[in-house]
């Protein structure tokens, strides 16, 4: 009965535009920032998130909901009377499903990806921050500085002489 009441507890989150989102407490607690506010009894009238837009907050809620749901399914499989190999198989299926979800989740435009990184950092959601930062790292991996500038629309503000000096100073990185 206590577990049932816990899953039904709802938290109100307010985006920077003032849009209100009602989310399950378990989902909101994925954010360490929100978790601390709830624990400090600061969530009674809703939690304002001035650094997170409604568009990004809805994506963050989608991510957190899926991960909470997946953990719940994995826990249920582990708690059941199923033999150990079946529980291991169920956990593997949940992990595979989450990997697929995560891979699809980060297939967004750069602006959204960067906003997700900022939101994950602000809300202190380690899994989301790791996922989004790894996505950016993968976008950079194996590219030349010129390709990276083009990918991220970065203006080269080095003169050719300054660029050559940086290359000389960091020669070890180009070997």
UniProtKB/Swiss-Prot annotation:
Belongs to the SKP1 family. GO terms for biological process: jasmonic acid mediated signaling pathway; protein ubiquitination; SCF-dependent proteasomal ubiquitin-dependent protein catabolic process. Involved in ubiquitination and subsequent proteasomal degradation of target proteins. Together with CUL1, a RING-box and a F-box protein, it forms a SCF E3 ubiquitin ligase complex. The functional specificity of this complex depends on the type of F-box protein. In the SCF complex, it serves as an adapter that links the F-box protein to CUL1. Part of a SCF (SKP1-CUL1-F-box protein) E3 ubiquitin-protein ligase complex. Interacts with rice black streaked dwarf virus RBSDV protein P7-2. Is able to form the SCF complex together with CUL1 and the viral P7-2 protein. Interacts with D3. This is SKP1-like protein 20. It comes from the Eukaryota. GO terms for cellular component: cytoplasm; nucleus. Transmembrane segments: none annotated. Pathway: Protein modification; protein ubiquitination. GO terms for molecular function: cullin family protein binding. Residues 117-175 are annotated as: Interaction with the F-box domain of F-box proteins. SUPFAM superfamilies: POZ domain, Skp1 dimerisation domain-like. Keywords: Host-virus interaction, Nucleus, Ubl conjugation pathway. InterPro entries: SKP1, SKP1-like, SKP1-like_dim_sf, SKP1/BTB/POZ_sf, Skp1_comp_dimer, Skp1_comp_POZ. It is found in: Nucleus. Pfam families: Skp1, Skp1_POZ. It comes from Oryza sativa subsp. japonica.
């Amino acid at each position: 009965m206590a577990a049932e009441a816990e899953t039904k507890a709802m938290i109100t989150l307010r985006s920077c535009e003032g849009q209100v989102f009602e989310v399950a407490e378990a989902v909101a607690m994925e954010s360490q920032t929100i978790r601390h506010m709830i624990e400090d009894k600061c969530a009674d009238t809703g939690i304002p998130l001035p650094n997170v837009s409604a568009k990004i907050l809805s994506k963050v809620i989608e991510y957190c909901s899926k991960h909470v749901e997946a953990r719940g399914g994995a826990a249920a499989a582990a708690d059941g009377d199923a033999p150990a190999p079946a529980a291991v198989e169920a956990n593997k299926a949940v992990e595979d499903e989450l990997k697929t979800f995560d891979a699809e989740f980060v297939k967004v435009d750069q602006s959204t990806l960067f906003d997700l990184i900022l939101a994950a950092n602000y809300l202190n959601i380690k899994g989301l921050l790791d996922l989004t930062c790894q996505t950016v790292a993968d976008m950079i991996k194996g590219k030349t500085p010129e390709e990276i500038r083009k990918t991220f629309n970065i203006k080269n503000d080095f003169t050719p002489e300054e660029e050559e000096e940086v290359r000389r100073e960091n020669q070890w990185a180009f070997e």
